[in-house]
């Protein structure tokens, strides 16, 4: 669970003032103003102690909650020492609230104070990636596999870097309808040592026909079935590709383990003997038809003829 963010409520419309906490402070001031910090300490302690009426568990005790990210995309314009102090105050508040779950902090912003992130007791660090860009206003065309070939972390030499877990709090190769990009992107994350990978964002079914959630993203199994299959295959990549495992550079890395991605065919595939998943029509033969336990796809394959447009 991400405990806090400091954005308005209006996207894509204008914000509507509600008198909430986020309207009392500027996005950057909220992390430096003493009164605001004190309020956040009280808030985060109350949040983890909150009892979910449906489960009967406080968030800090819920077995289905694995940890907390303290802030979504914080703003730290000050010094390393000021940033470290801010984080430590939040950590102390959580400790007093008897939280024992792992705690993470966003490190993909404010890199001038990056040293502070690794000089605290947070167990994990969170990152994001939009390798194709964002908010282009149209569906982009082309081969974007080179764009997802590497994920370089410029501050990986900082003291303490390798002692923190690495999590992706959001990613998307946005502004396109291709199905070949998700598995390649997740492969690159695993090569870079990431242990948790979150795609942003899935369109709710009631609005998915119109792509009105956050238009730069578009993903829903009913309306973008090829992309949804690509993400399904990417989930398998996250489990099957080893942390730090490398497959060379593009185009050699379009074939890796039991996976294949192709820009020309707009295709992602998993073919491991027991599972045969494909995001578009393919001529690939399953490794062993007699051992298949799961088939999922769009279009046709040597084992399924399908003329529909869904999955």
Which functions belong to the PLM regions below?
Residues 122-153, 220-260:
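Glycan-recognition surfaces
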Residues 1-122:
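Active-site mouth of glycoside hydrolases
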Residues 9-10, 78, 113, 135-136, ...:
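Extracytoplasmic/secreted cell-surface and envelope-processing proteins
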């Amino acid at each position: 669970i991400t405990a806090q963010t400091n954005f308005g409520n209006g996207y894509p419309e204008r914000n509507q003032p509600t008198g909430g906490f986020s309207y009392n402070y500027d996005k950057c001031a909220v992390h430096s103003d003493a009164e605001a910090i004190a309020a956040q300490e009280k808030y985060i302690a109350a949040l983890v102690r909150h009892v979910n009426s449906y489960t009967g568990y406080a968030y800090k005790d819920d077995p289905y909650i694995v940890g907390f990210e303290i802030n979504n995309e914080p703003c730290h314009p000050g010094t390393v020492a000021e940033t470290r102090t801010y984080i430590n105050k939040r950590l102390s508040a959580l400790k007093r609230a008897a939280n024992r779950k792992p705690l993470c902090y966003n490190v993909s912003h404010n890199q001038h104070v990056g040293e502070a992130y690794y000089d605290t007791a947070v167990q994990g660090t969170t990152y994001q990636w939009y390798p194709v860009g964002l908010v282009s206003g149209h569906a982009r065309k082309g081969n974007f596999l080179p764009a997802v070939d590497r994920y370089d972390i410029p501050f990986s030499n900082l003291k303490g870097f390798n002692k923190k877990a690495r999590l992706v709090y959001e990613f998307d190769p946005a502004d396109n309808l291709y199905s070949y990009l998700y598995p390649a992107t997740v492969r690159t994350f695993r090569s870079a040592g990431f242990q948790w990978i979150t795609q942003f964002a899935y369109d709710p079914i009631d609005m998915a026909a119109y792509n009105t959630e956050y238009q730069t993203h578009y993903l829903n199994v009913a309306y973008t079935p090829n992309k949804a299959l690509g993400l399904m295959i990417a989930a398998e990549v996250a489990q099957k590709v080893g942390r730090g495992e490398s497959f060379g550079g593009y185009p050699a890395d379009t074939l890796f383990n039991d996976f294949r991605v192709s820009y020309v065919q707009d295709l992602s595939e998993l073919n491991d003997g027991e599972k045969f998943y494909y995001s578009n029509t393919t001529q690939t033969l399953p490794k062993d038809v007699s051992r298949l336990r799961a088939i999922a796809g769009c279009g046709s394959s040597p084992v399924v003829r399908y003329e529909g447009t869904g999955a």
